[in-house]
Amino acid sequence: MLLVDTNVLVDVLQDDRQWANWSIRQRRAQACIHPLTINPIIDAEVSLSFSTFEGLDRAVSTLGLALREIPRPALFLAAKAFVQCRRRGGSRRQVLTGFFIGAHAAVEGWPLLTRDASRFSTCFPTLEVMAP
């Protein structure tokens, strides 16, 4: 499994000028190696790009994404990492949702495909981050 971060999916779905090509190539390449996965946090964040649930559901299916629940140990790790990163001077703009994503991948032992390598690498040092 490989967890695909929200920013990669938004790049693909909204045809982002700067990042769409990289995100499309990476998603396709990784789909040949790993089953692609999202969690409810990513699903909710991506849903902002759609006016209906059916549109979101079609896109998730078309992109070959499986939805996996976040295990409780990952929720625990997310909270601990959030507090630890804030204490080390992390940005006050960082929100807990990103920590749920990083902790989910870390606890499951899955790589994470993202454009936000620095935050995930800093807060989850054992996490395999695939980023530009």
Put a short name on every predicted segment.
Residues 1, 102-132:
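Acidic, PIN/NYN-like endoribonuclease modules and their adjacent C-terminal/linker elements
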Residues 1-38, 48-59, 130:
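Short, well-structured N-terminal submotif of metal-dependent ribonuclease cores
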Residues 2, 35-37, 64-69, 111:
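Short loop->beta-strand "edge-of-pocket" segments that line small-molecule binding or catalytic clefts
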Residues 6, 40, 97-99, 117:
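Conserved glycosyltransferase catalytic-site signature
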Residues 13-16, 45, 88-92:
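Short, flexible loop segments at the rims of nucleotide/cofactor-binding pockets, characterized by
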Residues 20, 43, 53-56, 75-79, ...:
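A general structural signal for well-ordered alpha-helical segments in protein cores
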Residues 66-115:
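Active-site neighborhoods of divalent-metal-dependent phosphate/nucleic-acid chemistry enzymes
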